[in-house]
Curated annotation (Swiss-Prot):
Name of this protein: dTTP/UTP pyrophosphatase
GO BP term (any one): nucleotide metabolic process
A GO molecular function held by the record: UTP diphosphatase activity
Family: Belongs to the Maf family. YhdE subfamily.
Lineage: Bacteria, Pseudomonadati, Pseudomonadota, Betaproteobacteria, Burkholderiales
Subcellular location, record wording: Cytoplasm
Protein's UniProt keywords contain Hydrolase: yes
Amino acid sequence: MSTSAASLHPFVYLASQSPRRQELLQQLGVRFELLLPRPDEDAEALEAELPGERAHAYVQRVCVAKAHAARARLVAGGHAARPILVADTTVTIDDAILGKPVDADDAFAMLTRLAGRDHEVLTAVAVVDAEGTLLPAALSVSKVRFAALHAEAIRRYVASGEPLGKAGAYGVQGRAAEFIGHIDGSYSGIMGLPLFESAALLRAARIDF
């Protein structure tokens, strides 16, 4: 049975500061408004790892925690009740979780570890519908193969500033593209928002696009 246009939501709240996620939503033709953490929120605390936590469990737990935090933010702020989209991305190699580097030295160490090897990029996506129900989250898993890299190439890339603020210390859509020999999975998932999974969740939440 088709859903009438009157029952569709005109936009979704995006609980993310990532420019890449905003670009990807625009690619789908999804209208959105940002729902960002308040100054008094400790958003970074949500991304803290638990002892012994594996990457797949970690990224899904953090995504769900972000979803609950975003819903609480919406209610506390008195915003109109609309669905909320959240996502979390991490990189994993050797069972280690590589999140956002804390500084240039950390970025250099991460990229040195990835050089010449395969790793996984995991992006979990969740939607809280307008009634406040968390829909089943989706997980995108992609494998990425990096070329062997000399230390000087890594230093030049780190000096560009691009690695900071990105899981695994690189952006697939930026200068790091020259390092990537092979991808098995979702390019948009590696960017931070897998469009196949996200579109399905947004349609389930009755977003008009």
